[in-house]
Curated annotation (Swiss-Prot):
It comes from Yersinia pestis. Positive regulator of YopE. InterPro entries: T3SS_chp_SycE, Tir_chaperone. It comes from the Bacteria. GO terms for biological process: protein secretion by the type III secretion system. This is YopE regulator. Disulfide bonds: none annotated. Keywords: Activator, Plasmid, Transcription, Transcription regulation, Virulence. Coiled coil: none annotated.
Length: 130
């Protein structure tokens, strides 16, 4: 089982980034235009999140259609923070199930999800079935 510090060290090595002398409870990594934040929350889980800037977050129903169920536990989930009502895209996985590539894959899926949200034009919400 990895500790949070070991997981961050491994991820920074994979990204060819210099490993911080002190690993803070929340670590930030810039991937392209996205600031991705990594923390252990709840205990035993690696949580990654980013704050995508969405052109029109008034259409929450349409944006939430991206939250379709998936077999992939790393698929990002779109939410809104309680305080400011800003969009938050996040995913997490258990520390005890990490392997050599799972953190990198988790970060990659988070960034791909943020890119999809920002570059795709808003699609119509799913049709209701009668």
């Amino acid at each position: 089982m990895y500790s949070f510090e070991q997981a961050i060290t491994q991820l920074f090595q994979q990204l060819s980034l210099s490993i911080p002398d002190t690993i803070e409870p929340v670590i930030g990594v810039k991937v392209g235009e996205f600031a991705c934040h990594i923390t252990e929350h709840p205990v035993g889980q690696i949580l990654m999140f980013t704050l995508p800037s969405l052109d029109n977050n008034d259409e929450k129903e349409t944006l939430l259609s991206h939250n379709i169920f998936s077999q992939d536990i790393l698929k990002p989930i779109l939410s809104w923070d309680e305080v400011g009502g800003h969009p938050v895209l996040w995913n997490r996985q258990p520390l005890n199930s990490l392997d050599n590539n799972s953190l990198y894959t988790q970060l990659e899926m988070l960034v791909q999800g943020a890119e999809r949200l920002q570059t795709s034009s808003l699609i119509s919400p799913p049709r209701s079935f009668s």
